[in-house]
Every structure is written in C-alpha cells, then in structure tokens.
Amino acid sequence: MAKHDSHLRCSFCNKSQDQVRKLIAGPGVYICDECVELCNEILEEELYDGNTPPATAPAASRRETPRKSSRSLPSLAQLPKPREIMRYLDQYVIGQEKAKKVLSVAVYNHYKRLAAKANPNSLGAAELDEVELQKSNILVIGPTGSGKTLLAETLARMLDVPFAVADATTLTEAGYVGEDVENILLRLLQVADMDVEEAQRGIIYIDEIDKIARKSENPSITRDVSGEGVQQALLKMLEGTIANVPPQGGRKHPYQDCIQIDTSNILFICGGAFVGLEKVIEQRIGKKSMGFIKPGEQLAVTREQRLADALKALEPEDLIKYGMIPEFIGRLPVVATLDPLDEKALEAILTQPKNAILKQAQKLLRMDGVELEFEPAAISAIAKEAYRRKTGARALRAIVEELMLDVMYEVPSRRDIKYVRITAEMVERRSTHELIPHPSTLPKPESA
C-alpha cells in the first residue's frame, strides 16, 4: 500500500507527492499546493484587476481596504454655495422656501466639514486648527406628498453623491423578525457599487421616521422592538461609528465577513408626516379652536393653516411627547418643516419644475409626433381634484395617468392625430376619448 501511495502525482503538473509539500486528493484526481497557488494568482489577475486586496490577505485587511473612489471629494472652493443649492432646488421643488433654505445651509456646512477634514491646512487661521466640526443630521417634517423625499433626492443629485432611501417601518431590534439597522448602510454601499470610501460621503434618507415613535410617553416594561428599540439602535449610526455591515444581509447569512463603514461622514436625513403632532404643539402652547366653522371648503383651509401655524411653533419637547426619545432628537439638530400644499402650489407643480408631470406627458406624445396642450381650466381642475384627495403632489400623477390613458393608447396607432387638447370637461369626466385632430390633418372636402 505504501508503494502505491509513493506513486501518487498531481493531475496538473505531474509532480509526485515526494516533490511537493502537500497533495490534495479529490474523486480520482490530485492537485498539489504549487498548482493551488498558481490558480490563486491567475484568479487575482483576471477577476480583481488590482482593485481589491488579494484573497490571500487576512480577512480584516480585505474589509478595511476600500476600493479607490472614482469621484474625489470637492475642495472648499468647489462646493456649491447655499444660494446655488437653493436655486437648484427651485428648479424641481415648488414652494417650501424655508425648508429649502434650511436644507441648503445644512448640506453646505456638512460637506464643508468633510472638505476641511480632507484639507486641514485650508482654514488659514491657526487658532481654529484644533476646533472639531461635528456632524448635524437633519429631520424633515411635513404632510404626505409635500416633497420630503424629493428634496433629499435633488440634493444628492446636485452634489453627485451616493443616495439611498430606507423605510423605518421595516426596522426592528437585532434578534427580532425584520431588518437590522445595518441594512440601511448596505443599501448605500450597493448604490456606491460596494465602494466603501464613496459610500462614506453619501446621503441616507430614512422615511416614515415617525412610525418608530414609542407607543407611550413613559418607558414601558415590555420591549418595543419596532419603536423605541429601533431608535436606540440608530443612535450610534447617526452620531458616527464604525459599523459592521454584512454584504449579503445579516439575517440569512450570519457567518459572512462584514464590511466596516465609518458613518461619521454620512449625512442622515430623517423624514416623516408626524400625524397628530399639531395637537401636541397646541396643547403645549394652550391654543384651542373656538367658535364655529362653516362646513365645506373653509374647514379644509382652516385645518391646513392650523397645521402650518403649529409646525412653526415646534419645539424638541413636542417631538419627545410625540414618542421620540431625547437622545434620538438630540442627534437630529437641524429641523426643517414643510407646509401643506394648496391648490395654487399643486398647479405650479404640474407645470413649472423641470420634470413637471405635464411636461413629461407632452414629451412622450411629441415622440409620436403629436402636440399636447392643457387648457388653464384643465390644469386648475386637476389641481382641485388632487387637493380633494389629500395626498399631496402624489395625487397629481395618478390623476394625469388616468386622464391620459385613452390618449396614450390611441395616438401611436393613428396618423391623423397631430394635436390633442385637454379641457376641464375631460378632467371632470376622467376621459379623453374625444381626441381633437389638428385642422391641417382633417380630410379636405371634395370639390363639386
């Protein structure tokens, strides 16, 4: 038997087991340690191409060595100023002037802080060299459909940084059914093509943050795993920490190597509608509705104005009474409140932004060689119906999509249609089957 073992050879290089350090046996084949090393070198050259640390390096060093970023951090002189950020936001977001100003200043200061860390000698004043600039995360409060997510998306697009959106309602404490808070960082990492350095200067928008308010003002003896427990889990991430992020999600693959991400340079924007917050504010300031209100439209305007006035008097203690823990509110020092959208604002949203819904519909039809026109009365009718639905700007797209269904269906197949006009009557009937062809395309009457 020993004689037979001495003639075992590598199936690739044909060296005997006496000529190599290790011979690995498989089902009918053998491979030596030298061939394994050669295969490893080939894989490194072809697959990694120098962007990832070698597989032979320790796991810790592979996690901590980020891929070289394709986009460098702009210098202080290259950063867009708050006025420039505001002008850019004006192109996509209608109204909300106070919120846009607050966000412009907060975002500028955040990335100015990153530029100062990258270029510490650019400050000039020696007495300020030891001053540490701390991060200021942002809390955005406003009714549904008022533009909270749109503001965050537009800021990220202007600054050309990775941007990820997370839903707070799916988060739970570690060990319970649901998503871990580290999955938020995983989304940002995926948007940055797994580039750690790039992800560490990105923006994360956490939506529905009001849904993780604790169920009662007083701490409970039972665990609140999707409310206060999530707030506690988010504290260190918001403040800045080295987080271990599982690249495939932590629950289904518990034994994978984690990627380390420093969250101290990531800007967190938390948004929520905070339904009922105005009642908490009014209770604090002792304001009560008195007298009689006529039914109908005046009631809606009064409720809208009541919400806007209440948010102007917002204090941190109101958010704490609502169910947010003090430590969580303390890590969101910048607060921007958005006003409810009235009919006039909804009309402007339909037509003024660069990506306005009506402009998108006109462009789609123009690709089929058809001009689309909305009468002013039709635009007002769409805004009025959207306001009635009480879902903010989101209702506009739903109404326009429903209204344009017949047009989008008929136009590509009909060469006689070169012009379509949408009237207020069509909006009220939710139907556009009466297509209006351009006079030049109508058949000419036969001469006698």
UniProtKB/Swiss-Prot annotation:
Record keywords: ATP-binding, Chaperone, Metal-binding, Nucleotide-binding, Zinc
Record-linked Pfam families: AAA_2 (PF07724), ClpB_D2-small (PF10431), zf-C4_ClpX (PF06689)
ClpX-type ZB domain: residues covered: 1-51
GO molecular function, one term: zinc ion binding
Gene Ontology CC: HslUV protease complex
Sequence positions that bind Zn(2+): 10, 13, 32, 35
UniProt region (Disordered), positions on chain: 50-76
Gene3D superfamilies: 1.10.8.60, ClpX chaperone, C4-type zinc finger domain (6.20.220.10), P-loop containing nucleotide triphosphate hydrolases (3.40.50.300)
Highest taxon above the source species: Bacteria
Protein's UniProt keywords contain Transferase: no
GO biological process terms held by the UniProt record: cell division; proteolysis involved in protein catabolic process
Family annotation (InterPro entries): AAA+_ATPase (IPR003593), ATP-dep_Clp_protease_ClpX (IPR050052), ATPase_AAA_core (IPR003959), Clp_ATPase_C (IPR019489), Clp_protease_ATP-bd_su_ClpX (IPR004487), ClpX_bact (IPR046425), P-loop_NTPase (IPR027417), Znf_CppX_C4 (IPR010603)
Residues that coordinate or bind ATP: 143-150
Database matches in NCBIfam families: clpX, PRK05342.1
Reported function: ATP-dependent specificity component of the Clp protease. It directs the protease to specific substrates. Can perform chaperone functions in the absence of ClpP.
Subunit structure and binding partners: Component of the ClpX-ClpP complex. Forms a hexameric ring that, in the presence of ATP, binds to fourteen ClpP subunits assembled into a disk-like structure with a central cavity, resembling the structure of eukaryotic proteasomes.
Family designation: Belongs to the ClpX chaperone family.
Protein name stated in the entry: ATP-dependent Clp protease ATP-binding subunit ClpX
Species name: Synechococcus sp. (strain JA-3-3Ab) (Cyanobacteria bacterium Yellowstone A-Prime)
UniProt gene name: clpX
